[in-house]
Structure formats: C-alpha cells, structure tokens
Amino acid sequence: MILEEIVNFKKEEVRKKKELKPYNELLNVNAVYRGDFKNSLNKGKVAIIGEIKRASPSKGIIREEFDLVEIAKTYEKAEVDAISVLTEKRFFKGEGGYIPQVKKLTTKPVLRKDFVIDEYQIYESKFLGADAVLLIVAILEDKLKGFCDIAKQIGLDVLVEVHEEEELETALKAGCDIIGINNRDLKTFKVDIKTTERLIKNIPKDKIVVSESGIKTPEDVLYLSSLGVKAVLIGESFMKMDEGRIKEFVKKVRGG
C-alpha cells in the first residue's frame, strides 16, 4: 500500500528532523503575516484552493518546468482563495522550504499539505509560516483530536481529511470544523468524485466541506457546490494549465 510506504518513510524523516532541529528551536517563530484559512473558505461562493504540487506517486512528475515563484504569483493573480503547498519530499517532490517562499509572494492563506504522523510536524508547520495544516484521519485515527487541539492552540487552522464513513465519524467526534473529503483512495490512489456526494450527506451544515482530488473542470466545481461543498482543492489540473487558463477557470466558477 502506498500510504503505508509513505508513513514508514515519514517516521524515519521525522526522527532525523528532531535531531537536526529540536522542539525548542521550532518554538522560536518569526512574526509573519497570518492568513485566515478558515474564513477564506467561508465567503458564500465556492472557494478555490490552488495547490502547488510537483509530482505524485500515481502520476510521477506532473509539472516538468516547476517554478515555485511563478506558480505562487499565478495563483495570486488568478485570485484563488487559498494556496495549498505539498511539502512531502520523497513521493511528491516537495520541500518544507516552499512554505516561507510562498508566504513572501502572496497574501492568501497557506495550507501545509503533508503526511503528519507526529506532533513535531504541527509545530514545524507553524515555524515554516503555514496558516493551516492537513491532518489525515486514515493515518492518525485516535490521535486526531489531540493533534487538532495542538494545532489550534498554536494558531493553525486544520483541514481534516477523510475518505470513508468511519473516518468521517472520527473527524466529527473530534469536533473538527473543516472537513476535507478526498475523492482519492489513499490505499489504491484511485479517484472517484462521487465520494464527495456519498459522504457529504452525513456532514452537519455548520461544517466547512472541502472536496479534494479529481476536480478537472469548472463544471465539476459547480456540481460539487450544488451538493453543499464550500471549497475545492485543485492541484494536478492547475499544474497542467498556464496562467491564462487558471484565471479563466476561476472566473468561470465565479460566474464571470
């Protein structure tokens, strides 16, 4: 299973990071502009989170000519509502250092997207300058509530990711207010956008629902919005578009 492989790699990676930069160093956070991730997704119209994603285990390299500065500026110009930055190194070719670079280039809230297995990574996310962090129920299970509490205590919003009914139940019991429905099964990496349709029926209306993966067209976004989705996260599709097409996509979703 790909997820198991990623988690095993993360365990070793975090162990090494703790040796290089102990907890106490992560607490020395420089003052950076803080974006309000939660409110950026709750403005009435469906919000768009543009993702910076160089590669994936299923597709390999997605964007050959990867220019972080150019992509961040494109998202800023296209007026997406928030930016997701994949920082996983081995399988997605990301870097933690992308976060502070992107923060310098945008006023949009920044989500750190990685595979969090240890509370160390939550403090690290804050240290890097992220405004929000992704927590995956399939990885954390009963650790979820404790990790959510830590994130909130240090001023980070949390996007809690689910794919199955059981995971959704765990997220709701933990009191999570931003629920990300991943249309991709992390065990097989197969994508089905109908996953959102299936799960959203069981989510209270006061929660902010984000649909992730497999979103390719403005029509997909409008369909998801009609189900009650408040925001969509788009990575691979945007990574294959130039600035003009991304702007056009966002404009069409907003009725322009």
Curated annotation (Swiss-Prot):
It holds the Pfam family IGPS. Its EC number is 4.1.1.48. Pathway: Amino-acid biosynthesis; L-tryptophan biosynthesis; L-tryptophan from chorismate: step 4/5. GO terms for molecular function: indole-3-glycerol-phosphate synthase activity; phosphoribosylanthranilate isomerase activity. PANTHER family: INDOLE-3-GLYCEROL-PHOSPHATE SYNTHASE, TRYPTOPHAN BIOSYNTHESIS PROTEIN. Belongs to the TrpC family. This is Indole-3-glycerol phosphate synthase. The lineage of its organism: Bacteria, Bacillati, Bacillota, Clostridia, Thermoanaerobacterales. The gene is trpC.
